[in-house]
Swiss-Prot record:
InterPro entries: Tropomyosin (IPR000533). The molecule is in a coiled coil structure that is formed by 2 polypeptide chains. The sequence exhibits a prominent seven-residues periodicity. It comes from the Eukaryota. This is Tropomyosin. Homodimer. The lineage of its organism: Eukaryota, Metazoa, Spiralia, Lophotrochozoa, Mollusca.
Length: 284
């Protein structure tokens, strides 16, 4: 009988120990589940931060590409303005040459007109001399008539030359007026281009400032990219470590669940044995 009582006491103590161990295992299992949930939350947070970091990196690269495109467009516009200024400078030089040639033609026409006027005056004087010497001999008259005819011919030629010179002078004046009009238009265009050049110069200075600022932003972007890249790598490493930790915790949870199941089975076996013992005692 004493042996049975001792056995019952031992079995009771073993049952209590099994209950304590089961409670400890359940508490440890709950703590493990909480740690697992916290790690999973950290892992999800790291994934969100990783996605945000990648988005920030894409936005930074897009902004950098936009700044570079604007700078290239500005450089192209400056080159086009410089080519237009060079073209207008060549046109102005050609107009100045045309004006010089027109002035030379005008001077030549004026000289020819002066010669024609002198010839006409000389013919008029000869005619008057012939009238005053009307009483000379026939040979003298014939000679004078010949001189008069020659003088008339010279006068007619002079008139023709005068008319031709006047016509050429009129044409020259028209050409000169056109050249002056083109020159005025060219000067106006030059003034306009100078104003545009001033604006372009101001724009260039502004663009240089913007370019300097863009360079500073680019340096800042590069630093940000490096920082984001490092943060991304760190997040990836932490995510990898979290995955490993989650895997370990899952294995630990499985082990604890198996151990808890074993303890429950042992507890059931002890309970069954106690029930059998009580039944045996009741039989006495």
């Amino acid at each position: 009988m004493d042996a049975i009582k001792k056995k019952m006491v031992a079995m009771k103590m073993e049952k209590e120990n099994a209950l304590d161990r089961a409670e400890q295992l359940e508490q440890k299992l709950r703590e493990t589940e909480e740690a697992k949930a916290k790690i999973e939350d950290d892992y999800n947070s790291l994934q969100k931060k990783s996605i945000q970091t990648e988005n920030d990196l894409d936005n930074t690269q897009t902004q950098l590409q936009d700044v570079q495109a604007k700078y290239e467009t500005t450089e192209k516009q400056i080159a086009e303005h410089e080519q237009e200024i060079q073209s207008l400078t060549r046109k102005i030089s050609m107009l100045e040459e045309d004006i010089m040639k027109s002035e030379e033609r005008y001077t030549t026409a004026a000289s020819k007109l002066e010669e024609a006027s002198k010839a006409a005056d000389e013919s008029e004087r000869n005619r008057k001399v012939l009238e005053n010497l009307n009483c000379g001999n026939d040979e003298r008259i014939d000679q004078l008539e010949k001189q008069l005819t020659e003088a008339k011919w010279i006068a007619e030629e002079a008139d023709k030359k005068y008319e031709e010179a006047a016509r050429k002078l009129a044409i020259t004046e028209v050409d000169l007026e056109r050249a002056e009009a083109r020159l005025e238009a060219a000067e106006a265009k030059v003034i306009d281009l100078e104003e545009q050049l001033t604006v372009v110069g101001a724009n260039i200075k502004t663009l240089q400032v913007q370019n300097d600022q863009a360079s500073q932003r680019e340096d800042s972007y590069e630093e940000t990219i490096r920082d984001l890249t490092n943060r991304l790598k760190d997040a990836e490493n932490r995510a990898t470590e979290a995955e490993r930790t989650v895997s370990k915790l899952r294995k630990e949870v499985d082990r604890l669940e198996d151990e808890l199941l074993t303890e429950k089975e042992k507890y059931k076996a002890i309970s069954d044995e106690l029930d059998a013992t009580f039944a045996e005692l009741a039989g006495y």
